[in-house]
Regions:
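Short, hydrophobic/aromatic-rich segments at coil-to-beta transitions
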Residues: 1-5
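Short aromatic-glycine-(Arg/Gly/Cys) micro-motifs in beta-strand/loop hairpins
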Residues: 8-31
């Protein structure tokens, strides 16, 4: 899964990458720095702790990302 959403503070999008096949779990933040995680669970936890709807141009994009993360977590937990 790759997802982009636009921060109020940057011309470049924030990017979320969850790639189970290749073991890549990373984000690019508004300041274009990044974070790399050991698992999708760590990445999701970081996003929920550090990003808020008010950080982004579109609340809709933010909530859609949260839905995607919820669905992803459900699929992993249920083994689908």
């Amino acid at each position: 899964m790759e997802y982009n959403l636009y921060s109020k503070d940057s011309a470049y999008p924030c990017e979320v990458t969850i790639d189970e096949e290749n073991g890549r779990y990373m984000i690019r933040k508004a300041d274009t720095s990044g974070e790399i995680f050991n698992s999708a669970a760590e990445l999701t936890s970081w996003i929920r702790s550090n990003w808020k709807e008010t950080d982004f141009r579109s609340k809709k994009q933010y909530y859609y990302l949260m839905e995607l993360l919820d669905e992803y977590e459900w699929e992993v937990e249920s083994g689908q």
